[in-house]
């Protein structure tokens, strides 16, 4: 028998594995509880609803795909950073087929605002990272950006 999963991070890890093996349709409270060898109530200790569970799993997938590289040279210039982003998108596509196109469909209609909020936070985090790389890239001329053509507009 599998060891019972007891932490939120372990539940998210099992959820990601369910998506890899069975696709998005496999994600519901009962299936995740069964895969974790815990009761449905144990899942509700961490997640208030299916939408909350799905949202947290989606967020953890984004985190896995785009977690900051241990190779700091990736973030020293924009070309290396963009190449890394594409490598990570390829990784995400292989690990989670259809994720980029389908994840937003997983949110229950009434709870869509929470999903959009999570996605907006993730997107802002990524944009801030790109902005920082642009601002510190030694290959970018100091006069490349001005008040009209800002790093943000780029």
Give each language-model segment a name:
Residues 56, 70-95, 147-154:
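Hydrophobic alpha-helical connector segments
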Residues 1-6, 143-145:
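N-terminal intrinsically disordered/low-complexity leader segments
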Residues 10, 14, 18-52, 56:
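Helix-turn-helix
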Residues 28, 66, 98-103, 142-144:
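Short, hydrophobic secondary-structure boundary micro-motifs
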Residues 94-98, 111-140, 149-152:
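Amphipathic alpha-helical packing segments from all-alpha helical-bundle domains
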Residues 59-66:
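Short, basic, alpha-helical segments at the C-terminal edge of helix-turn-helix-like DNA-binding modules
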Residues 47, 102-111:
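Short helix-capping/turn signature of helix-turn-helix
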Residues 4-5, 16, 30-32, 60, ...:
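Recognition helices and adjacent regulatory flanks at domain boundaries
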């Amino acid at each position: 028998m599998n060891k019972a999963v007891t932490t939120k991070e372990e539940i998210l890890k099992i959820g990601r594995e369910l998506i890899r093996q069975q696709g998005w349709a496999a994600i519901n409270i009962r299936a995740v509880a069964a895969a974790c060898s815990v009761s449905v109530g144990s899942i509700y200790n961490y997640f208030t609803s299916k939408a909350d569970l799905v949202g947290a799993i989606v967020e953890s997938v984004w985190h896995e795909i785009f977690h900051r590289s241990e190779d700091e040279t990736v973030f020293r210039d924009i070309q290396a950073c963009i190449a890394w982003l594409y490598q990570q998108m390829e990784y995400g596509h292989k690990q989670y087929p259809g994720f980029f196109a389908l994840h937003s469909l997983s949110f229950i209609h009434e709870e869509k605002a929470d999903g959009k909020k999570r996605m907006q936070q993730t997107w802002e985090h990524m944009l801030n990272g790109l902005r920082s790389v642009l601002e510190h890239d030694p290959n970018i001329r100091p006069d490349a950006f001005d008040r009209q053509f800002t790093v943000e507009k780029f």
